């Protein structure tokens, strides 16, 4: 079964995906493994199927002519192609005969200046390919069909297009009407009134799901038999469904364009009905249904021509003699020959299907060139004209080959700034630092002639996808933005086409969310590659789009262990919390988890002590613990809390110092050995434990929060899925914390298991994508319970901290001294499970790191050993009265640090909290993290919940005010999963090229690639030649799902320090490609103010937030402008300056931003 759209593109690290690399490498953003693809692997074959003469091969680029030394085209060595003309008559028997009257080629005989005609044999697969193209399309069907075929042996991928050409006796009526009937949507009564049908909707939807619709006629028995999986699914097979059409007046016969949903083509689990509803004809359903009955294969194969068919051309006129109008079908096939390496084939297949709109657009351009060549050939009987027509096809083929190969092989920017921020990278602090470093460099070295402000002005004016990212919460959504992120007429399309994130991403990149719709791209020209690359990296912050994440839907009864490799099912016998009966709890955990208790002998001494700290592993020798020791554990007034994501240790105050290297070697081999209860979970970072603050409150305190913040100078480790230089702030209300019920059963009845299962996607974009690196299932929030051997049931009253994270590895160690754990009287009616507390009226309220005080420190001298993901709080002799729980009398003030994490990662701290009065809830210690700076609360901002290191603002907030203002936002952001199903997010270890956001942001390219949204080139020679034709092509054959009013290209010349904007609506004049950009004063002030903040040693994170705030100001000014212009027809620029304080230089930018939310602004100002 072929892969779907969002399946991971490359299975190996050598593929197109960005390899794992050190983000500190200044050039890491521009390293992208380049796949190999030769232009000769692309083959073009053109057929015509005439009602009288049968099927002919007009052009085949794979057939070499007899005179090998003759070159027909000047463009390359791959131009030894078959001659244009009806040279190969395909007969039903499979034989082929050469027709010498039409094929032309240049003669090498100097004496004979006239063109000679030569015949050549047809290729061996001509019959087969012809059957595949025409196979199930009846001659009566006048529409255009687009099909994709996968040939297994030899591995080939074919994209074919069949369209109708009408011919007559007169020259004017010959091929002048070479247009697809899809384009005639009842707009002209003299043109075809065929139905508006599309093919690609259903066809791509079935690729990889099942094998559909074999060709109507069997393949020729004369040729070799090949295994062919044809993905063709035609409109004649579809049932009438409610599918809206779109306005078309040009050659836009793209089935994808009509579907307005690319993702549905690749992930629909059933054949999508493909019919499009003609706007002005309500009876199209009936006509489509009749045609489906008469042409469907289920009803048998009908004769090719029948006077009974309702789609003959007898009532149409294309010339003075409509009675003798003849009809031809032209088929264009582009065949991609794949390598024998299966991995390479998979890479190209994924690239092809994920970028299909681009392939289809270039296919349409090739089709137009072939049409023009055919017209030229038919208009004249002169052999020279036919040779010229042939050369045109060769030229168009070479251009197609070059474009596709460049699109596939050119380098990309490996780590775009905005997308990397949105993906929740653990390197966010370093990312901000690098961005500000590049920003400072460019402001100091690229500001000549106001180059950088002009470029940013042009980018913000045309690439408008940044506007929704700075909108504050609570603002009404941008109508046009929402339309671009869904299908047109979404209510009707939703019946068969789901939401299309890939299409939304493509529209974002091109900035096509304004009104009128403009498609923008940016090209940086410069001979200094380093400068160009740095500028490209900087621009990826402003050219934004949505990030894509792949999810799999698990239906009822589907085994999660199959979908989640390495997971293991564990069960436990639980006593009912209401009834007395027992029930079995089945949970999942990772195979490599500590739950398996497969401790290595290397980390244990013979007496079951820890190799690192010489502390006994309780789980290994729990039987040797005396009853007296158990009582000591229960009655101890010392509390040992270990805060960890992977390793939890409880050590004595006199823990010995260990070699960090030795610890690192074995740090993944520890296993937890004792039982614990999860009560309240607080997302934390880490800080030196001696700086941790414990609140002092009464015994009946509802909640006490113990936070830790680790050293800020720790190294990052991309092999883990958390943050390295900051803490994760997870904004979740109390009702979003996943409760964990804990058992009251004895240890003998337990089996190791995981509690808590939150498979629905997290609304926090940062946290959703942090488990990428280690393929950790980030939707599982699982506290751990470990077996304790023969410990009595009253041991259940002990409380320790547990780890609640995506990973299941938790290591716990217990000191040699009697384990001094706080006790919780299980007989107390208030000591109920967190599950009960969660649903109780006076439930626990849990706060994030935003609300907990901490002090940062750089002191790391007291660390005894180093364990990844572990933070230990150990007791010392000196104590202080810090009442934490009912059963905790004292808590150590001067805690030693036994083991600290090698890097700063997201931690969860679970603390025991009994029920009590709510008065103490106001006594909670409030904290402001370093990111607590008044700023916009944009839901799309990648930095909204991020953190900084050196901002140094300790702002306090009351919990009530903290939650009160955002409770409504939380309610709106709740995602309710489908009943009986769960969404599993597939975490790609590395970003792949299968999404437009990373594949269309090009690096420094050797030649111009028209499809790239952003790219750098060294020379503008070829760029100048093809720019205007590319812009015109973008308007005529849009890759988006709607007509494009204008295509623009921002040209930044770093050699001349100029910024111009070329438009499809303006012609090149005075040797200039476009119009000079007017620098916006708002943008100039934005850049300079951000630079000044950074020069005053403010943190890079704060500077980036300031930049976001200034961008938000642009949005508010555009709102102010739109409100002022509402209801007015014309407004003078001076009036805007006096009333609104808007300068004339800012008007184009603000008008473009306003067009995203107020379309009428464009009618007044633009």
From Swiss-Prot:
Cross-linked residues, Glycyl lysine isopeptide (Lys-Gly) (interchain with G-Cter in ubiquitin): 1119
GN (gene name): FNIP1
Positions of glycan attachment: 938
Domain dDENN FNIP1/2-type: 1102-1157
Protein name: Folliculin-interacting protein 1
Free-text note regarding domains: The KY-finger orients the Cys degron for ubiquitination by the CRL2(FEM1B) complex.
Modified residues (Phosphothreonine): 294
Domain cDENN FNIP1/2-type: 486-1092
Listed PANTHER family: FOLLICULIN-INTERACTING PROTEIN 1, RE13835P
Region (Interaction with HSP90AA1), start-end ranges: 929-1166
Record: residues binding Zn(2+) 2: 610, 613
Impact reported for residue 1134 to R: No effect on ubiquitination and protein stability
Keywords: Cardiomyopathy, Cytoplasm, Disease variant, Glycoprotein, Isopeptide bond, Lysosome, Membrane, Metal-binding, Oxidation, Phosphoprotein, Ubl conjugation, Zinc
Assembly notes: Homodimer and homomultimer. Heterodimer and heteromultimer with FNIP2. Interacts with FLCN (via C-terminus). Component of the lysosomal folliculin complex (LFC), composed of FLCN, FNIP1 (or FNIP2), RagA/RRAGA or RagB/RRAGB GDP-bound, RagC/RRAGC or RagD/RRAGD GTP-bound, and Ragulator. Interacts with HSPCA and with the PRKAA1, PRKAB1 and PRKAG1 subunits of 5'-AMP-activated protein kinase (AMPK). Phosphorylated FLCN and AMPK are preferentially bound. Interacts with HSP70, STIP1, PTGES3, CDC37, BRAF, GCR and CDK4. Interacts with HSP90AA1; the interaction inhibits HSP90AA1 ATPase activity.
Disorder association: Immunodeficiency 93 and hypertrophic cardiomyopathy: An autosomal recessive disorder characterized by onset of recurrent viral and bacterial infections, particularly with encapsulated bacteria, and hypertrophic cardiomyopathy in the first months or years of life.
């Amino acid at each position: 079964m072929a892969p779907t759209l969002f399946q991971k593109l490359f299975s190996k690290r050598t593929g197109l995906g960005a390899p794992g690399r050190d983000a500190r490498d200044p050039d890491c953003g521009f390293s992208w493994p380049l796949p190999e693809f030769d232009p000769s692997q692309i083959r073009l074959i053109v057929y015509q199927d005439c009602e009288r003469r049968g099927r002919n091969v007009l052009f085949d680029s794979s057939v070499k002519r007899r005179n090998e030394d003759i070159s027909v085209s000047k463009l390359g060595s791959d131009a030894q192609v078959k001659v244009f003309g009806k040279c190969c008559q395909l007969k039903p028997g499979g034989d082929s005969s050469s027709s010498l009257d039409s094929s032309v080629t240049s003669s090498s005989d100097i004496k004979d200046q006239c063109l000679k005609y030569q015949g050549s044999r047809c290729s061996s697969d001509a019959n087969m390919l012809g059957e595949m193209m025409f196979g199930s399309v009846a001659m009566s069907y006048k529409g255009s069909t687009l099909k994709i075929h996968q040939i297994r042996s030899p591995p080939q991928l074919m994209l074919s297009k069949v369209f109708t050409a009408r011919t007559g006796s007169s020259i004017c009526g010959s091929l002048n009407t070479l247009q697809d009937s899809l384009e005639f949507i009842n707009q002209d009564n003299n043109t075809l009134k065929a139905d508006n049908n599309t093919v690609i909707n259903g066809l791509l939807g079935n690729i990889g799901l099942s094998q559909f619709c074999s060709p109507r006629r069997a393949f020729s028995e004369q040729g070799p038999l090949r295994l062919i999986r044809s993905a063709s699914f035609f409109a004649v097979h579809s049932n009438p469904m409610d599918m809206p059409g779109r306005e078309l007046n040009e050659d836009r016969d793209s089935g994808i364009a009509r579907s307005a949903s690319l993702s549905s083509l690749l992930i629909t689990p059933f054949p999508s009905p493909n019919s499009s509803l003609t706007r002005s004809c309500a009876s199209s359903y009936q006509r489509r249904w009749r045609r489906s009955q008469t042409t469907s294969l289920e009803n048998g194969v009908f004769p090719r021509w029948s006077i009974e068919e309702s789609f003959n051309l007898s009532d149409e006129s294309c010339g003075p003699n409509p009675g003798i109008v003849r009809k031809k079908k032209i088929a264009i096939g582009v065949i991609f020959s794949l390598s024998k390496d299966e991995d390479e084939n998979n890479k190209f297949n994924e690239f092809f299907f994920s970028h299909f709109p681009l392939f289809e657009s270039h296919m349409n351009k090739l089709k137009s060139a072939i049409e023009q060549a055919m017209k030229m050939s038919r208009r004249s009987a002169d052999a020279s004209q036919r040779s010229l027509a042939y050369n045109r096809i060769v030229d168009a083929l070479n251009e197609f080959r070059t474009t596709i190969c460049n699109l596939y092989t050119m380098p990309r920017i490996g780590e775009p700034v905005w997308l990397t921020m949105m993906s929740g990278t653990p390197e966010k602090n370093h990312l901000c630092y690098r961005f500000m470093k590049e920003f400072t460099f460019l402001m100091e070295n690229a500001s000549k002639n106001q180059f950088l402000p002009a470029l940013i002005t042009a980018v913000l004016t045309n690439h408008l996808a940044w506007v929704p990212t700075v909108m504050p919460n609570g603002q009404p959504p941008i109508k046009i933005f929402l339309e671009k992120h869904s299908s047109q007429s979404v209510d009707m399309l939703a019946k068969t086409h789901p939401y299309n994130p890939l299409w939304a991403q493509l529209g974002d990149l091109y900035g096509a969310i304004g009104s009128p719709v403009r498609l923008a791209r940016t090209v940086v020209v410069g001979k200094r590659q380093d400068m160009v690359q740095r500028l490209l990296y900087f621009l990826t912050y402003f050219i934004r789009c949505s990030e894509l994440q792949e999810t799999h839907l698990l239906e009822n009864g589907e085994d999660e262990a199959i979908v989640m490799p390495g997971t293991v099912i564990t069960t436990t016998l639980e006593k009912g919390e209401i009834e007395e009966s027992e029930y079995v709890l089945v949970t999942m955990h990772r195979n490599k988890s500590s739950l398996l208790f497969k401790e290595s002998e290397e980390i244990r001494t013979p007496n079951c002590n820890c190799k690192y700290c010489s502390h006994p592993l309780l789980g290994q020798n729990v039987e040797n613990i005396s009853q007296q020791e158990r009582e000591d554990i229960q009655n101890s007034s010392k509390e040992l809390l270990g805060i960890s994501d992977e390793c939890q240790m409880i050590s004595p105050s006199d823990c010995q110092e260990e070699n960090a290297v030795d610890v690192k070697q074995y740090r993944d081999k520890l296993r937890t050995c004792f039982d614990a209860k999860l009560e309240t979970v607080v997302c934390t970072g880490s800080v030196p434990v001696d700086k941790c603050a414990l609140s002092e409150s009464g015994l009946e305190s509802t909640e006490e929060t113990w936070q830790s913040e680790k050293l800020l100078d720790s190294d990052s480790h991309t092999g883990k899925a958390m943050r390295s230089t900051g803490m994760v702030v997870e904004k979740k209300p109390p009702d979003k914390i996943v409760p964990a019920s804990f058992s009251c059963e004895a240890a003998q009845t337990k089996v190791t298991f995981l509690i808590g299962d939150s498979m629905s996607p997290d609304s926090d974009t940062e946290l959703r994508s942090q488990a990428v690196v280690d393929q950790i299932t980030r939707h599982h929030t699982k506290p751990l319970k470990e077996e304790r051997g023969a410990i009595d049931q009253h041991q259940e009253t002990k409380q320790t901290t547990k780890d609640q994270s995506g990973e299941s590895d938790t290591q716990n160690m217990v000191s040699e001294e009697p384990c001094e754990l706080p006790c919780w009287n299980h007989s107390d009616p208030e000591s109920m499970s967190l599950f009960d507390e969660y649903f109780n009226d006076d439930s626990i309220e849990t706060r994030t790191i935003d609300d907990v005080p901490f002090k940062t420190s750089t002191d790391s001298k007291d660390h005894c050993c180093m364990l990844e993901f572990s933070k230990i709080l150990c007791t010392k002799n000196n104590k202080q009265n810090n009442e934490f729980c009912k059963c905790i009398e004292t808590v150590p003030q001067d805690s030693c640090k036994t083991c600290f994490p090698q890097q700063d990662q997201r931690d969860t701290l679970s603390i025991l909290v009994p029920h009590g009065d709510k008065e103490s809830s106001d006594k909670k210690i409030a904290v402001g993290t370093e990111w607590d700076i008044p700023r916009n609360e944009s839901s799309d901002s990648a930095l909204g919940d991020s953190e900084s290191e050196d901002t140094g603002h300790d702002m306090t907030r009351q919990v009530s005010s903290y939650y009160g203002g955002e409770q409504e936002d939380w309610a709106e952001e709740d995602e309710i999963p489908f009943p009986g199903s769960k969404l599993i997010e597939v975490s790609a270890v590395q970003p792949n090229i299968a999404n437009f956001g990373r594949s269309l942001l090009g690096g420094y390219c050797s030649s111009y690639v028209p499809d790239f949204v952003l790219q750098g080139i060294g020379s503008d020679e070829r760029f100048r030649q093809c720019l205007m034709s590319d812009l015109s092509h973008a308007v005529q054959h849009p890759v988006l799902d709607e007509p494009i009013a204008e295509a623009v290209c921002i040209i930044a010349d770093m050699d001349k320090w100029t910024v111009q904007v070329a438009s499809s609506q303006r012609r090149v004049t005075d040797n200039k490609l476009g119009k000079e950009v007017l620098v916006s004063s708002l943008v100039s002030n934005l850049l300079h103010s951000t630079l000044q903040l950074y020069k005053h040693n403010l943190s890079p994170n704060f500077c980036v937030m300031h930049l976001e705030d200034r961008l938000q100001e642009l949005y508010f000014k555009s709102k102010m402008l739109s409100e002022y212009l509402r209801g007015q027809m014309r407004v003078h620029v001076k009036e805007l300056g006096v009333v609104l304080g808007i300068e004339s230089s800012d008007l184009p930018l603000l008008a473009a931003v306003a067009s995203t939310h107020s379309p009428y602004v464009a009618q007044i100002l633009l």
